[in-house]
Every structure is written in C-alpha cells, then in structure tokens.
C-alpha cells in the first residue's frame, strides 16, 4: 500500500472519530463562528474613556530590540556560522602549521644524522680500503 493512501486513511479516520467531518456534512445550516469582534473587546473599547475602564499604556519602543526582532533573511545566521567556521579553520591551520614545522625540524635532524652516518660510513670504508691496501702491499 502506498504511503499517500495510508496517510489519507489515517486523516479520514481521525476526522471521522473526532466528529469534525460529520458535523459539517450532516448539518450544513449549523451556525458557524462569525468574523466579528467579540462583545468583550467592543465593551472594553467603550469604557476606556471612563475612569473605571481598563486603559492600555503605550510602551517606549527600543530600537535595538526592534531591529533584533524584525523579519530578515538568514544573512545574520550565515555570518555567524561563517565566522565560526573561519575561526575553526584558522585554529586548525595553526595546528597543522605547528605540526608541519615540527615534522620539518624532525626531518632536518634526521637528514643531519643521515649525513653524519654517511660520512662515518665513508670514513670506515676508506679505513678498510687502506687496511686492505696495506695488507696487499705487505704480502707482495
């Protein structure tokens, strides 16, 4: 069974169980809510001139909060998110740069050690060649 049919059956069953669908279908002449201001609101408007009536006070508008609450696009949110991402990447780049610097220092140390090792090997090879040369010249 498809999902749309399943959802349609659920909506119809819910409306039928709640009596919403049948009430409008069975009694089309049933009184509906009228789009007129309620009597309480009209009465309160009339009594504002009297001393005992409820009077509403005007509140000073705060321009900062008005700017914060006005509808706007996602620009401010995106600016905050991009600032956060830039800050995150700058921290990550700093960590990567430190790691690369440490790696380069380690490589320089290893290269220096390898150079010393190669020089030592060359010295040992020359010493062995000299010994072999002297042995050959002694035997001749």
Curated annotation (Swiss-Prot):
Disruption phenotype: Leads to reduced virulence on etiolated soybean hypocotyls. Changing residue 123 to A: Impairs interaction with host ADA2 and subsequent virulence. ADA2-binding IR repeats lie at residues 100-113, 114-127. Changing residue 110 to A: Impairs interaction with host ADA2 and subsequent virulence. One of its GO terms (cellular component) is host cell nucleus. Keywords: Host cytoplasm, Host nucleus, Repeat, Secreted, Signal, Virulence. It comes from the Eukaryota. A motif (RxLR-dEER) lies at residues 54-72. Pfam families: RXLR. The keyword Methyltransferase does not apply. Residues 1-21 form the signal peptide. It is found in: Secreted; Host nucleus; Host cytoplasm. Effector that suppresses plant defense responses during the early stages of pathogen infection. Suppresses cell death induced by effectors and PAMPs in plant hosts. Acts as a modulator of histone acetyltransferase (HAT) in plants. Avh23 binds to the ADA2 subunit of the HAT complex SAGA and disrupts its assembly by interfering with the association of ADA2 with the catalytic subunit GCN5. As such, Avh23 suppresses H3K9 acetylation mediated by the ADA2/GCN5 module and increases plant susceptibility. Belongs to the RxLR effector family. The RxLR-dEER motif acts to carry the protein into the host cell cytoplasm through binding to cell surface phosphatidylinositol-3-phosphate. Interacts with host histone acetyl transferase SAGA complex subunit ADA2. This is RxLR effector protein Avh23.
């Amino acid at each position: 069974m498809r999902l749309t049919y399943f959802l349609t059956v659920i909506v119809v069953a819910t409306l039928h169980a709640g009596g919403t669908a049948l009430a409008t279908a069975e009694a089309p002449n049933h009184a509906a809510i009228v789009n007129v201001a309620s009597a309480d609101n009209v009465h309160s408007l009339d009594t504002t001139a009297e001393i005992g009536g409820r009077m509403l006070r005007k509140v000073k508008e705060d321009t900062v909060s008005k700017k914060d609450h006005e509808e706007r696009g996602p620009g401010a949110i995106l600016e905050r998110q991009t600032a956060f991402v830039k800050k995150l990447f700058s921290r990550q780049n700093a960590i990567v740069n430190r790691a690369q610097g440490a790696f380069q220092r380690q490589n320089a140390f290893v290269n220096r050690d390898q150079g010393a090792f190669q020089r030592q090997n060359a010295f040992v090879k020359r010493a062995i060649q000299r010994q072999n040369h002297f042995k050959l010249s002694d035997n001749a």
